[in-house]
């Protein structure tokens, strides 16, 4: 029960923080810089705008993937070990999925352009990346005791 509470609090917290930051940019916030711009972009695809050609079906594919991941984590008992990173992952994923349904694309706002143009991203993306790194580190460097 404690693991589920941690998971839920982290997921809800990430979702709320993500949506509040995105609201700032949807309301016109902009900050230009020499290496990083904080400006509104809508990503119709996934990372690096891949799969944008799927169009309106992408949100349904992502909803199924999120549901599948959630089912797998809960049914296999992984939540006990990975409650916090799973919360990061699901909270970020739901934040971006919400954008697809409400704004027809993910609201991105951090644009790196120092020396080269990097993908534009958001807080939810960072939460997802942190979750994946955290889980990989735990799996490979701190495997569960048999």
Swiss-Prot record:
Residues of the active site: 108, 125
Biological or metabolic pathway of the protein:
Protein modification; lipoprotein biosynthesis (signal peptide cleavage)
The principal location of this protein is: membrane
Quick check: keyword Transmembrane in the entry?
yes
State the compartments where it is located: Cell inner membrane
Q: Which UniProt key words apply to this protein?
A: Aspartyl protease, Cell inner membrane, Cell membrane, Hydrolase, Membrane, Protease, Transmembrane, Transmembrane helix
- What is any Pfam family matched here? Peptidase_A8
User: Which Gene Ontology terms cover its molecular function?
Assistant: aspartic-type endopeptidase activity
EC number(s)? 3.4.23.36
Parts of the chain that traverse the membrane: 6-26, 50-70, 82-104, 123-143
The GO cellular component terms are: plasma membrane
Keyword Transmembrane (UniProt):
yes
Give a GO biological-process term.
proteolysis
What is the superkingdom listed in this entry's lineage? Bacteria
Q: Which reaction does it catalyse?
A: Release of signal peptides from bacterial membrane prolipoproteins. Hydrolyzes -Xaa-Yaa-Zaa-|-(S,diacylglyceryl)Cys-, in which Xaa is hydrophobic (preferably Leu), and Yaa (Ala or Ser) and Zaa (Gly or Ala) have small, neutral side chains
Q: How does it sit in the membrane?
A: Multi-pass membrane protein
Entry's InterPro entries?
Peptidase_A8
> To which protein family does this belong?
Belongs to the peptidase A8 family.
Q: What does this protein do?
A: This protein specifically catalyzes the removal of signal peptides from prolipoproteins.
Protein name per the record: Lipoprotein signal peptidase
Q: Which organism is it from?
A: Sulfurovum sp. (strain NBC37-1)
What's the encoding gene here? Answer: lspA
